């Protein structure tokens, strides 16, 4: 029996699981519906190139910061962070005649704003103070969920006394504080970082993003796809595991307490089973947990009715359309900095932005260069534009590749429009494009299970904070939430929420125990040293086997036939897939062509020139 079951393997879920395993020695089972762990931190590959689905840049990763300590602990120090250029973001507002590079210093940022808008000098200084105060207010909210219960009342009192403008709508704050519409537009250019347009978002969401990048931005060397596999090592060290292709159907309740989950195993023919544990932690979002995984009637439904009503009242957040490009080369001037371009002159309206995007005339886009940030040799680009998920409802329930000609025409129009818009900000981009792939809210829904494909879970409106929904606690004993709906969105926001959840699970001593572990962590051994060891080994948790390459031969110029010997392996069947470690923290799924005796036979496509193509 496991000590805890975690539903989902996003960064919040993995943080909670990793801390419970590392700090308390807990045996944790993580259940992931897909064949790759990591949620929105996972990466995907095409022809050797890779794109990071949800991690585009991370702030507050300087040595000694709390997020840096947390990630160092979870990954055993194996994760290296590349610092982005000092001007990590470039804001382009053609309608206001502005192109501004954001510096990696809050003080320099304030001076820059004053130099551009000297007539707003006093208001800018007040704005910078308000941003820091709102940031401190949200930090206190995190602390309220981490500290022992006896300290919580004092923190909640401080929160009530120091709310200030934190729960004011961002657009209302900007209109009240600044006269110049160009300055208001510039300051809110990057609202896509928290997913709710200024007319709806709480000012604290804006403030958290501004302060998050106060000291610059970082990106994981090698890309974000390795993060989940690094944290997995800590989970496995105490007998836990990440189990893939597992659909959690229900959370099991006994006498008002969560006692386990009902799961469908889809690794081969679907099989239903139950797993029991005294602690159940959901990392798939509050809406999904309360409306799908838990009963909505009977005693449990009565306990959760108030929360479900509050969630329904909030409505949905925004989603996004992303165009993934490979280039022959990077255009002149591209250095890895992000580019935000917005052609609108008035306040951003997500409904109008969505209509324009679907017509192939997008107003705004976020442009990222993951290959440069990760230190990859391939030239890759991501162009993201935010959209209402309702625009894609007619294709809800359809499968990728089977959505019809109308969908193909729509995605082609959106891709052309976004590439054209990006080319205006980065001349020469269009001519360098080699391949194009498009993801819509339907893609996000498929990978996150968020209703409608909402990128950031519950929208960061004043109503969300007033309803006190951003918490790991639930009305059900033994059940906790983790991830962005238990705190704030983004990689660090979700990870800190995961830390809050671990503190709750561990009880009054949880916070000091975790802080002691982060402070006292010691360097770990190099994980790459044993990556080519061929001795047979079965490690903790799910079965892992060391295989010997028995035969490797070419079937065609692009396909290699590889037979692996696994003397202690259980019976495999043709048609199943195996995850094969092709490099440290790099696992690839391969379909089994056959599995005679103690061997398995794989057919490997080598066209990608990836790590698995070099056997």
Name the predicted role of every residue range.
Residues 2-136:
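N-terminal glycine-rich phosphate/pyrophosphate-binding loop and immediately adjacent elements
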Residues 62, 159-172, 214-233, 243-245, ...:
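Short beta-strand to alpha-helix junction loop
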Residues 180-194, 362-366, 424-488:
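A glycine-rich dinucleotide-binding beta-alpha-beta segment and adjacent secondary-structure elements
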Residues 207-271:
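Helical element adjacent to the flavin cofactor pocket in flavoenzyme catalytic cores
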Residues 219, 249-376:
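Mid-domain catalytic core of redox enzymes
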Residues 329-439:
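C-terminal segments that line or cap access tunnels to active or ligand-binding sites in enzymes
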Residues 537-615:
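Ferredoxin-reductase
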């Amino acid at each position: 029996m496991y000590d805890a079951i975690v539903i989902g393997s996003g960064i919040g879920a993995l943080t909670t699981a990793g801390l419970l395993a590392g700090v308390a020695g807990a045996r944790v089972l993580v259940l992931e519906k897909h064949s790759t762990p990591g949620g929105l931190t996972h990466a995907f590959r095409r022809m050797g190139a890779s794109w990071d689905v949800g991690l585009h840049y991370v702030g507050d990763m300087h040595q000694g910061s709390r997020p840096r300590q947390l990630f160092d602990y979870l990954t055993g120090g194996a994760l290296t962070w590349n610092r982005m250029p000092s001007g990590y973001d470039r804001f382009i507002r053609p309608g206001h005649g502005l192109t501004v590079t954001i510096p990696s210093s809050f003080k320099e940022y304030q001076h820059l704003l004053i130099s551009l808008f000297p007539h707003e000098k006093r208001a800018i200084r007040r704005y910078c103070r308000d941003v820091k105060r709102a940031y401190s207010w949200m930090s206190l909210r995190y602390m309220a969920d981490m500290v022992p219960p006896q300290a919580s009342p004092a923190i909640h009192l401080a929160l009530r006394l120091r709310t200030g403008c934190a729960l004011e709508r961002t657009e209302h704050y900007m209109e009240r504080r600044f006269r110049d519409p160009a300055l208001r537009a510039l300051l809110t250019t990057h609202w896509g970082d928290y997913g709710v347009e200024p007319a709806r978002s709480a000012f604290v969401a804006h403030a958290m993003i501004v302060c998050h990048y106060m000291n610059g931005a970082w990106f994981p060397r090698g890309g974000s796809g390795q993060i989940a596999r690094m944290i997995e090592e800590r989970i496995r060290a105490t007998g836990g595991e990440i189990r893939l292709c597992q659909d959690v159907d229900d959370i099991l309740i006994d006498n008002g307490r969560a006692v386990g989950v009902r799961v469908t195993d889809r690794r081969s023919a679907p099989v239903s089973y139950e797993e029991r544990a005294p602690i159940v932690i959901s990392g798939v979002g509050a809406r999904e947990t309360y409306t799908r995984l838990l009963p909505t009637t009977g005693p449990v439904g009565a306990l959760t009715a108030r929360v479900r009503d509050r969630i329904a009242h909030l409505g949905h957040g925004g989603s996004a359309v992303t165009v993934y490009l490979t280039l022959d080369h990077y255009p002149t001037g591209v250095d890895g900095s992000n580019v935000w371009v917005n052609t609108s002159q008035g306040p951003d309206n997500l409904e109008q932005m969505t209509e324009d995007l679907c017509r192939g005339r997008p107003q705004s886009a976020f442009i990222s260069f993951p290959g440069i940030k990760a230190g990859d040799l391939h030239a890759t680009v991501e162009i993201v534009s935010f959209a209402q998920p309702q625009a894609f409802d007619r294709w809800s329930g359809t499968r990728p590749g089977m959505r019809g000609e109308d969908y193909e025409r729509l995605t082609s129009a959106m891709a052309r429009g976004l590439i054209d818009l990006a080319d205006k900000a980065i001349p020469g981009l269009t001519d360098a494009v080699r391949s194009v792939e498009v993801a819509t809210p339907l893609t996000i829904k498929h990978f996150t299970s968020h209703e409608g494909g909402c990128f950031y879970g519950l929208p960061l409106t004043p109503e969300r904070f007033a309803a006190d929904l951003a918490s790991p606690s639930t009305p059900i004993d033994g059940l906790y939430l983790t991830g962005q709906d238990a705190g704030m969105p983004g990689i660090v926001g979700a990870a800190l929420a995961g830390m809050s959840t671990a503190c709750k699970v561990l009880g009054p001593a949880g916070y000091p125990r975790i802080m002691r572990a982060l402070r006292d962590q010691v360097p770990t051994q190099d994980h790459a040293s044993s990556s080519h060891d061929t001795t047979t080994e079965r490690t903790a948790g799910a079965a892992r086997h060391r295989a010997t390459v028995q035969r490797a031969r070419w079937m065609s110029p692009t396909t290699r036939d590889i037979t692996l010997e696994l003397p202690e392996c259980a019976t495999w069947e043709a048609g199943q897939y195996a995850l094969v470690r092709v490099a440290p923290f790099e696992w690839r799924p391969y379909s089994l062509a056959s599995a005679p005796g103690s061997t398995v036979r794989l057919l490997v496509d080598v066209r990608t020139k990836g790590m698995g193509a070099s056997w």
